[in-house]
Amino acid sequence: VRLTRAFYIATREVTNTQYRAFQPNHTSGAEKYQQLAAGSHPAVMLSWQDAAAYCNWLSDQEKRPRAYAAIGGQLVLATPLTSGYRLPTEAEWAWAARYNGGGGSRRYPWGDAMPPPAGAGNYADRTAQGVVANVLADYSDGYTVTAPVGSFSPSPLGLFDLGGNVAEWVNDRYTVYPAGGALAVDPTGPADGQYHVIRGSGWRHSGISELRLSYRDFGDSGRLDVGFRIARTTDDKER
């Protein structure tokens, strides 16, 4: 993959307080009596469509062109791309998450080796025993479910929670990419498909494969461990 298009990406996941400015009655729910609805915690129990609708609403607040168009009752990425708020593409998310400076990349959010060091992020840890089935037995982050966004150390680019806290919706529809495929330039995902890609790990994850920054999941409805962050393409005045 090659990225040639400049973009902004939020340093933090969208919080309950921020999402409720758009949908005041939204609740992020609870897991085994553990509440996920605190204002500073990431907004969850949102479908991909809910996340895209928030992006359009935020664009409206700043009088930017909407990034998503309504077609057949569903929001889809507008073409050509606008400078409105949207979800990061999968390629943008992956580049931002794996960036390690000096041309290198990371295997895990904290570096290249297991286990995570103290304070690495909010994962399924000893604190979450009894709430999730599998935990990192020798790790404790102090949070049973979600944590306030930005509670742990940022990435080299200054981005928080690209691993841990909640997994995140990205723009692209889900597909299985063949190994050794042609170079993709600024990809935005397949044009069709029921499911969208989810990237990153969260408070329910403890497995080696789940904690890797290459981990991909997919879905179309809200989950207690999936939120989102916003991005947008730069406009001509910002380049």
Positions of PLM-derived features:
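A short glycine-rich, aromatic-capped structural motif
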Residues: 1-30, 39, 44-59, 164, ...
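Short, charged low-complexity linker/loop segments at the C-terminal edge of domains
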Residues: 64-65, 234-239
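Short, solvent-exposed loop/turn elements at domain surfaces
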Residues: 10, 16-21, 95, 117, ...
